């Protein structure tokens, strides 16, 4: 966690994923079919990353991502790259409202550890090499809590004598991975996390085992904070609390109230929170989430990335003003509610509409914070 003056998250910021161009989707299909080589696919990938980085810089973003073009899933590709984690067919779609996903999943195949050859390191090095001076290369990875979910840790007893021993290894693997990103020159990392929205749904369900999910929340705080402990002081680490994002559909609904006490304990420099519609509830929980940490920024995701219609600037400004009853304006920032393509399928809007959404975020933020 940084100890210097707030920089990132910026007053206007990008969550991470961008719509995959047709050329990249085709290249992925050809690679899977064996009709092009990995080097040929990588050349197309780099060309498209260079293009979207230039577009982000042109828009005026102070931190840019590679659009997550080097991965198919926002979370699984990273998890598969850790030592002790393997890929398998779950034979079930993730339960999005109104659509079905591919059935890939991750599972423990050994003790979890940092992998010095994780493919995300090479992807970051390419991004870093093309980002101009004065702009940060932002790296997104899934939260360690994503290994708790969807049967991914079911066989932990094969490799560990206790659940706590597993959590300790998981935290260390993440800590070492984040440290290596920093050693490669990364100063801005974001941990994306749907677990909190999952817990919102469970803790609001009168038939759910609340004691079990409360323990889950406590473990999540423990692992995340252990992963963040003793990292360099000039490294910014944020999180994005996601409710699911697949072809413009979602997984979870509910206000942040039931998880706010836990979110307030997390030692992040900033939290990106989805607030694009009534499913997210109101701003009442912001006071607990921010937890009166003058160093921390709450990034309000008031602009949807799921649909092309542009929000009205006046409405966005009114909502930011409403949030100041819980968090000072100096500790707030603005973004889209999520990325545009958490999986390579992408949301139901065009690339031009995607850039228009980001331009709206930037323009509105500059009106709210003239110094932005």
Question: Where is each model-derived feature located?
Answer:
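Domain-level signal for soluble alpha/beta catalytic cores
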Residues: 1-372
């Amino acid at each position: 966690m940084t100890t210097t003056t707030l920089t990132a998250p910026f007053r206007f910021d990008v969550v991470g994923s961008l719509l995959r161009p047709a050329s990249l989707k085709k290249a992925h299909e050809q690679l899977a079919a064996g009709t092009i080589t990995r080097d040929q696919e990588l050349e197309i990938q780099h060309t498209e990353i260079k293009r979207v980085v230039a577009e982000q810089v042109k828009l005026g973003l102070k931190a840019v991502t590679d659009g997550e073009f080097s991965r198919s899933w926002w979370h699984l590709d990273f998890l598969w790259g850790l030592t002790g984690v393997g890929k398998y067919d779950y034979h079930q779609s993730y339960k999005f409202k109104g659509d079905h996903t591919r059935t890939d999943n991750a599972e423990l195949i050994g003790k979890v550890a940092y992998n010095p050859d994780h493919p995300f390191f090479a992807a970051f090095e390419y991004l870093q090499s093309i980002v101009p001076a004065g702009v940060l290369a932002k790296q997104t990875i899934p939260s360690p809590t994503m290994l708790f979910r969807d049967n991914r840790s079911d066989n932990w007893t094969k490799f560990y004598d206790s659940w706590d021993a597993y959590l300790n290894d998981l935290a260390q693997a993440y800590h070492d991975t984040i440290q290596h990103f920093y050693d490669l020159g990364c100063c801005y990392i974001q941990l994306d996390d749907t677990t909190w929205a999952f817990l919102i749904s469970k803790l609001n369900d009168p038939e759910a085992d609340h004691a079990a999910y409360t323990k889950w929340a406590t473990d999540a705080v423990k692992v995340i904070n252990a992963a963040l402990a003793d990292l360099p002081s000039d490294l910014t680490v944020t999180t994005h609390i996601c409710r699911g994002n697949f072809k413009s559909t979602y997984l979870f609904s509910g206000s942040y109230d039931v998880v706010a006490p836990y979110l307030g304990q997390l030692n992040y420099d900033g939290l990106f929170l989805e607030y694009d519609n009534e499913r997210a509830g109101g701003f009442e929980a912001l006071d607990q989430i921010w937890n009166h940490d003058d160093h921390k920024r709450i990034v309000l995701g008031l602009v949807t990335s799921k649909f092309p219609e542009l929000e009205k600037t006046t409405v966005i400004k009114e909502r930011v003003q409403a949030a100041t009853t819980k968090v000072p304006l100096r500790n707030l920032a603005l973004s889209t509610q999520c990325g545009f393509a958490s999986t390579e399928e992408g949301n139901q809007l065009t690339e031009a509409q995607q850039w228009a959404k980001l331009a709206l975020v930037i323009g509105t933020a500059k009106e709210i914070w003239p110094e932005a």
